[in-house]
């Protein structure tokens, strides 16, 4: 090898140290910073059997997604926003700019912001300010609440309404603080794509900072509008004036303007391959109008009006929650129908994960998480305020308990969530049990070919390998569980939405309350169970975030989901966790461009690092790509991304990537790997490729473990490596040297 070649290693999910990535005890950073940096072995430390011209370098980006436990919990708090943002990226190929899926997804995201604000309003303004504070038994012995009882109604509501604004500002701060090291990182792009479909090779694809700012202004206006409407609606009910009506109508005009802006494309159309500039028309006026209306609404609310003492729920709040659920049900149905229509037009939809319905599944999961959080928050606060008596539509409060009445919609949503959780759990168990025999038979065939004549003492180890191979294929068997979840979510949100028309579960509970006590008690127990189960699920998500710091397996599982969700830009919900790829991809592109000025580069991506590598290469110009080769290992490019996000990383994109780099591409995979897999051809060594050349030459299977018997110079059998590590396998080094020899030194 007469020319210098740098093997640039990019790690996968859950991160790893630069020392482990380079398999070297002493490393030094040569570029980047503490968040994401490039490292090399320090010269003079350790021996290497590689040629001097073949150097190793590592890109460590794990700090972009990892952090303290407090940060992880704050990101889990943003889970619903992340899921709805992911929906638009999981759409089927459309051949256009996304069709209806983009606008519908943005509207769904706005309803989640509205639901968030309504849940905070429900706790502060409704439960505390309207229902608890005027009721002396509720504030007795609670000095932190007793002072509110001495305030007039208007000032009390205005003071408590500051908390939803603070919560909205917290969301803004979380996203803004975390994105400072991600967004607005200089991004290039080769601009070779055509057509209207947004593609990963578009210039500026990974620079959406202005899009996020635009969405953030709209969502803040939505949140403030929902708060203003809640305050003014209550004021109109107790003391109607023309000023209140004018402000109320103005707030709804503001919300309508937000809907229009969300339906419009975020970027202006342009001729050519590049992306148009962000359309910021009307955003400044929207921001000024939203702030002005909020100040006026607070000013009107704070004036003491001497109304009748409040009783029951905050006027209009129950109906507002029910109306929001109705809108969400309609939008989710439109999203599902649109996805089904576009799925029929896509290439090979049966090969897609979730049968091409990933977009509505993610949206439904976002709603489930959002209402799980909301129901747990509202009902647990109500449970605390009324001193342990759980409000129930079919069972009256105990004598002497504060008559708190949270929105019954949350209760029905929790019950629907309980039904969905139970059915999904049953479907998952059933599916795993039904496929166990087939997976075991497949594992028997694989292990039998890898180890045809094992010694008798290796039979227990052989059984372990069979079990690992069988478990590695479980993920592909869970499609029915997710589809059941989608169907039940659509049915559940539709049934809950019927409350708005007087034919929903609330009317059923009222009829049951006048009949036999058994039916009433059964309904009460079911809804109570729903509240507790959904609350436990929400708590479990938070606990999972903490456990990920103690268990490597848990951390890896959480990281797979989290790194997938935060890989894509925030083009739907601005309060989703920030997109780390908006820094990682341009940074990798810049480093590769600099290195190719001195020689060749082999970008070696493990697991999710292979996705970053592919996205980076799609942004590089042809003169740089002529000096680049790609080595992927443990890669989910086809197993997960091509099937989950076919519009952006589908098979046509992967074939185009191979052509751009002259098919200087090797992919290593194992049957024991539950995450990675083949990309083009799942053939074994000695078998003909299942795809025509040159794509059929990319995939190379590694036997794992290397043997099931104890080597003569060891005391234990070789480990079952599963998903990590790959770089310690002899086939890995052989692939690196092969690709280095195929690089053009010119």
Stretches found by the model and what they are:
Residues 621-625:
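Short helix-capping segments at alpha-helix termini
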Residues 547-586, 627-629, 635-746:
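Lipolytic serine-hydrolase domain surface
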Residues 604-614:
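Gly/Ala-rich beta-loop-alpha elbow adjacent to hydrolase catalytic centers
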Residues 1-577, 592, 740:
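N-terminal membrane-targeting/anchoring modules of bacterial envelope and secretion proteins
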Residues 587-599:
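Conserved acidic catalytic loop of the alpha/beta-hydrolase fold
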Residues 615-619:
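Active-site signature of alpha/beta-hydrolase-fold catalytic machinery across serine-
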Residues 210, 583-586, 590:
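Short, contiguous clusters of charged residues that form electrostatic/catalytic patches at enzyme active sites
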């Amino acid at each position: 090898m007469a020319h210098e070649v740098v093997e640039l290693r990019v790690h996968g999910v859950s991160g790893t140290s630069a020392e482990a990535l380079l398999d070297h005890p002493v490393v030094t950073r040569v570029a980047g910073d503490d968040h994401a940096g490039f490292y090399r072995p320090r010269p003079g430390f350790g021996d290497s059997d590689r040629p001097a011209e073949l150097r190793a370098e590592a890109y460590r980006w794990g700090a972009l997604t990892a952090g303290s436990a407090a940060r992880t919990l704050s990101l889990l708090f943003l889970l619903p926003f992340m899921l709805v943002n992911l929906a638009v990226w999981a759409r089927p190929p459309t051949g256009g700019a996304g069709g209806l899926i983009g606008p519908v997804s943005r509207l769904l995201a706005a309803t989640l912001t509205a639901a968030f604000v309504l849940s905070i309003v429900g706790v502060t303004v409704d439960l505390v300010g309207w229902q608890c504070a005027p009721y002396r038994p509720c504030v007795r012995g609670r000095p932190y609440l007793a002072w509110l009882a001495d305030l007039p109604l208007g000032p009390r509501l205005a003071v408590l309404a500051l908390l939803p604004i603070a919560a909205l500002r917290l969301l803004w701060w979380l996203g803004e603080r975390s994105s400072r090291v991600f967004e607005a990182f200089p991004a290039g792009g080769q601009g070779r794509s055509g057509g209207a479909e947004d593609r990963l090779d578009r210039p500026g694809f990974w620079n959406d900072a202005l899009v996020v700012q635009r969405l953030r202004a709209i969502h803040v206006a939505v949140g403030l509008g929902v708060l203003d409407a809640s305050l003014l609606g209550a004021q109109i009910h107790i003391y109607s004036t023309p000023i209140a009506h004018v402000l109320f109508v103005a707030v709804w005009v503001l919300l309508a303007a937000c809907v229009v802006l969300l339906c419009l494309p975020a970027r202006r159309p342009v001729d050519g391959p590049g992306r148009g500039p962000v359309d910021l028309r009307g955003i400044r006026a929207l921001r000024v109008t939203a702030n002005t209306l909020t100040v006026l609404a607070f000013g009107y609310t704070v004036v003491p009006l001497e109304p009748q003492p409040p009783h029951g729920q905050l006027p209009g709040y129950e109906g507002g929650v029910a109306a929001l659920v109705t809108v969400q049900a309609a939008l989710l149905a439109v999203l599902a129908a649109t996805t089904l229509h576009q799925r029929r037009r896509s290439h090979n939809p049966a090969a897609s994960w979730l049968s091409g319905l990933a977009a509505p599944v993610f949206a439904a999961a976002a709603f489930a998480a959002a209402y799980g959080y909301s129901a747990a928050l509202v009902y647990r606060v109500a449970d605390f305020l009324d001193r342990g008596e759980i409000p129930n539509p079919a069972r009256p409060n105990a004598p002497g308990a504060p008559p708190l009445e949270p929105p019954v919609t949350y209760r029905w949503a929790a019950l629907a969530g309980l039904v969905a959780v139970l059915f999904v759990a049953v479907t998952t168990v059933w599916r795993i049990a039904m496929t166990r025999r087939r997976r075991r038979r497949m594992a028997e065939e694989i292990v039998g070919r890898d180890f045809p004549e094992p010694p008798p003492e290796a039979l227990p180890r052989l059984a372990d390998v069979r079990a690992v191979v069988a478990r590695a294929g479980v993920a592909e068997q869970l499609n029915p569980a997710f589809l059941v979840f989608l169907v039940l979510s659509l049915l559940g949100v539709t049934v809950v939405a019927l409350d708005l028309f007087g034919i929903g579960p609330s009317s059923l509970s009222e009829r049951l309350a006048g009949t036999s006590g058994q039916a009433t008690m059964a309904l009460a127990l079911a809804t109570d169970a729903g509240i507790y189960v959904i609350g436990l699920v929400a708590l479990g998500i938070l606990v999972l975030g903490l456990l990920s710091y103690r268990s490597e397996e848990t951390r890896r599982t959480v990281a797979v989901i989290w790194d997938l969700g935060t890989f894509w830009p925030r083009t739907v919900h601005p309060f989703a966790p920030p997109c780390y790829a908006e820094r990682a991809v341009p940074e990798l592109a810049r480093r590769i461009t600099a290195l190719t000025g001195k020689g060749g580069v082999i970008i070696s991506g493990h697991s999710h690092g292979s996705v970053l590598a592919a996205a980076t290469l799609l942004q590089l110009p042809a003169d740089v790509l002529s000096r680049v080769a790609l080595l992927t290992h443990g890669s989910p490019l086809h197993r997960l991304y091509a099937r989950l996000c076919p519009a952006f990383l589908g098979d046509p994109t992967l074939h185009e990537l191979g052509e751009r780099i002259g098919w200087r591409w090797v992919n290593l995979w194992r049957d024991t790997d539950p995450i990675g897999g083949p990309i083009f051809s799942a053939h074994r060594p000695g078998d003909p490729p299942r795809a025509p050349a040159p794509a059929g030459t990319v995939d190379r299977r590694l036997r794992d473990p290397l043997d099931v018997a104890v080597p003569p110079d060891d005391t234990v059998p070789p480990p079952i490596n599963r998903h990590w590590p790959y770089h310690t396998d002899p086939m890995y080094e052989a692939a690196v040297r092969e690709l280095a020899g195929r690089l053009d030194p010119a």
